Every structure is written in structure tokens, then in C-alpha cells.
């Protein structure tokens, strides 16, 4: 969302944006991303505690929000990163009947459940619904079907950074933005960093990313 806001500010307020850096973003969500977001929304809406969004304070649809966050968190990672961190490591090495219960068995299950439960304590379900829908509806292509019409308003120099393992916002989507800016004669640069943390790569304290931002 931050990268999308950055681009929108550069378009809507060209006289107020001196320069910008957009990390791991896109001009609009593709079908797969919308599908993930809607599945998360359905987890919330299907929770009996949602009550059409009119749940009382302190009694939000915690289970639905937790599941939505678990699934979304998977999209922030990468297959390589998850395999390196978790693989098939188990929390419990005691032999058990395979279908006697569905408690946490693998480390990755424990990690995702923790992420979901922790999210519930600091985030609101209705807010999650609104934010994911806003992300899905964001579209720089607009009704004309091209980026050029929107990006021709940009007057400031910009840097767009993509990450090789980001499958939520793949590098090609970042490149498309810069290619459109260059077609319009704008001052734009693109850098693609090879990192295995998926979309979350932009959150890591990477010396390469820090050096890139500082130099820009």
C-alpha cells in the first residue's frame, strides 16, 4: 500500500513531491492478489462474530481475522525463504495417530498461528476489510487501460525497487511502472534486488537496500 500511495501522491500533487521512492509495489492488483484478499475477507465475514460489521467493542470476529492474516502472511514470504526457515521441522516429535487431532505439528503452522493471533490483538476486522478492498480497487490504468495517461502528471524524479522473490507484487509490475515513465520522458530509475524474503524483503534491514536509498 505504501508504494501505491507514493505513486498516487506523485501523480496527484506533482508540485508538492520533490522526489519519491516506491518499494515493492504495482499499478494495480492482478487476479491472484485479489483472490487472496477476498478469501481473507470471506474468512472474516463467515465468522459468526462479525454480525454484518456491527460487532461490539472488544468482541470482534477474532477467528476469521486470524485466519485472514495467516493466509495473507504466506503471500508476504517466499517458498525459498519458508523452506530455509521451517522446512518440515516439527514442534512435537512424539508419534501420534495422523488424524487424532489437528493441533500444531509443524513449525510453520506454529509460526502462522502466532502471526494470526498476534494480529487480532492490534488490528480491527472491519478495517482489514476496508483496507484490502481499497488495495484491490486501486488502479493506475484507470478507464483508459494505460499507465501513460496517469503517469504523465508526474514531474518529480523517482526510484522504483522490486525484489526477485516477491510473488505478491512481482518485479515485472514494478518494471512496467518505470517503463511507462521512461516512455513519457520522465526521470525514473528501476533497481531489482535479489533477496529471498518475498514481499517482506522491503522490511528487512538490508545493507544493499539501505545503501540504495541513501545514495538516491
Feature locations, PLM:
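Short glycine-enriched nucleophile-adjacent loop
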Residues: 3-14, 20
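Alpha/beta-hydrolase-fold enzymes
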Residues: 16, 22-118
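Active-site nucleophile elbow and catalytic-triad environment of alpha/beta-hydrolase enzymes
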Residues: 114-115, 130-150
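Acidic catalytic loop of the alpha/beta-hydrolase fold
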Residues: 118, 135-139, 164-169
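Short alpha-helix in the alpha/beta-hydrolase fold that links the catalytic acid
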Residues: 143-148, 170-181
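Short, conserved loop/helix-junction motifs that constitute active-site signature segments
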Residues: 151-155, 182-184
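Short beta-strand/loop motif that positions the catalytic acidic residue
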Residues: 154, 160-162
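Catalytic active-site module of serine/aspartate enzymes centered on a nucleophile-bearing elbow/loop
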Residues: 175-216
